[in-house]
Amino acid sequence: AYMPNLLPGQFKVRDVNGWECDDFGNPILDKNGRYKYTGKPDGVLNEADMVLLGTTDPGFSMGFGNTFSYKGFDLNIFFYGMFDRLVYNATRDKYSFFELRRVLQGQNFLEEVNDSWSSTNTNSNNPSGIVTTYPQPSSYLMEQGWFIRCKNITFGYSIPQRLLDNIKMGKIRVYAELGNPFVITKYTGNDPETDFKAGYPNQRSYMFGLNLTF
């Protein structure tokens, strides 16, 4: 990485590419009007060092649901998921090592800040929190964003029809529904589906209901 005068524990960015320039230092364009790359480090961190890591759009999605019934009981479960995608952990960007100046503003931070690199904690892989000379988004905060979410689980019971005939009722069903009970993912932020600058995750809900048919 070409980042002179860095202090121990500061965030380092790799210099991977550069632009071809003429004798006056002006970038050379190809026949399509785009900058030509040297394919090797040039001692400058700029747009030439940007690389395409992936996309937040899923490579493929899936959904699965089923209803199980036994006598008067019924159980419905629905799952869905997204795969082959990357997510930028903006929550860590805002509430972790890169915004420690917010401590002076009395804001809260993620617990991982306690494991920042320091002279007494040299085995940590986390930056020291000292203001860096390159405060731009990087691959350090990119994570696998695949997930499988259980959207809802509904459990119900229908009163036997032979009992309802005596009171002239067509159907009575009681049920309980749990929305968004859990999600399976390797993403370390709040929610791989909604996370942006500590945005609210998908809420969990509880519902109880009664279906009556006359």
Spans of model-derived segments:
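Repeated loop/turn-to-beta-strand initiation elements of outer-membrane beta-barrel proteins
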Residues: 72-77, 162-163
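Outer-envelope beta-barrel architecture signal
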Residues: 60, 71-73, 146, 168-172, ...
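Outer-membrane beta-barrel pore domains and translocons
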Residues: 69, 80-82, 177-181, 213
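Conserved small-residue
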Residues: 1-56
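Extracytoplasmic gating/loop element in the C-terminal half of outer-membrane beta-barrel translocons
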Residues: 5-6, 10, 26, 82-174, ...
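Membrane-embedded beta-strand positions of outer-membrane beta-barrel proteins
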Residues: 77, 174-176, 210
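Membrane-embedded beta-strand positions in outer-membrane beta-barrel channels/transporters
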Residues: 63-65, 152-156, 207-209
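C-terminal beta-signal and terminal closure region of outer-membrane beta-barrel proteins
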Residues: 1-10, 100, 113-116, 135, ...
